[in-house]
């Protein structure tokens, strides 16, 4: 019985401690609202996880940088692992082997939640589960988020999808809509 209880707890608990700092250009743009909204829904998922006996932690912050070039450079060099930038800021750049797309956000502009390819796929998968488990709440956090859906958040664009997003997509589409 104890083993069964522990296995059930793992379904609801964070699979690991998560710490993310999401880089954005300005507090005045939608990128900042998206970053704060991601932190909010992940925190909600953590609260649910704790109510089922989970003991892991979440640290979610935003960091400002005025230049998209600097943000991309810091992600490429793995100084920071996450950023939200406008998709149009990536169009005229050479393809980069180290940038990966986590989610696309079709808000007032199209935005991309990116990371470095070296980020643990299980962390990315947990982030995706946290966002998708609370997609309804996420949609109501800002008027430009209302059209978000499962089908328009995970889209292969110019930047390749992160391995964690691919794993998440496979599990989500097969009906494994677990809590993290």
Each language-model region and where it sits:
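Beta->alpha turn/N-cap motifs
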Residues: 66-68, 78-90
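Short amphipathic alpha-helical coupling segments at ligand-binding clamshell hinges
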Residues: 34, 119-130
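A bilobed periplasmic-binding-protein/Venus flytrap-type ligand-binding module shared by bacterial periplasmic
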Residues: 21-24, 106-123
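Extracytoplasmic "Venus flytrap"
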Residues: 19-37
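Short, polar/charged alpha-helical segment
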Residues: 31-54
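An extracytoplasmic/periplasmic, membrane-proximal ligand-sensing/linker region
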Residues: 132-180
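Short helix-initiation/N-cap motifs at beta->coil->alpha
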Residues: 49-73, 77
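Ligand-binding "clamshell"
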Residues: 77, 92-108
């Amino acid at each position: 019985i104890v083993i069964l209880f522990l296995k059930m707890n793992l379904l609801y608990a964070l699979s690991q401690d998560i710490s993310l700092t999401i880089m954005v250009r300005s507090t005045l743009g939608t990128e900042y609202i998206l970053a704060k909204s991601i932190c909010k829904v992940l925190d909600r998922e953590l609260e649910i996880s704790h109510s089922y006996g989970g003991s892991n932690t979440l640290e979610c912050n935003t960091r400002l940088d005025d230049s998209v070039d600097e943000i991309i450079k810091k992600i490429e060099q793995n100084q920071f692992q996450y950023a939200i930038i406008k998709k149009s800021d990536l169009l005229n750049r050479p393809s980069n082997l180290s940038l990966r797309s986590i989610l696309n956000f079709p808000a007032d502009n199209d935005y991309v939640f990116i990371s470095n390819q070296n980020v643990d796929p299980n962390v990315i998968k947990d982030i995706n589960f946290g966002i998708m488990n609370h997609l309804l709440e996420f949609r109501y956090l800002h008027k430009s988020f209302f059209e978000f859906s499962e089908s328009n958040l995970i889209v292969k664009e110019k930047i390749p999808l992160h391995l964690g997003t691919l794993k998440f997509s496979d599990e989500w589409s097969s009906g494994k809509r677990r809590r993290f």
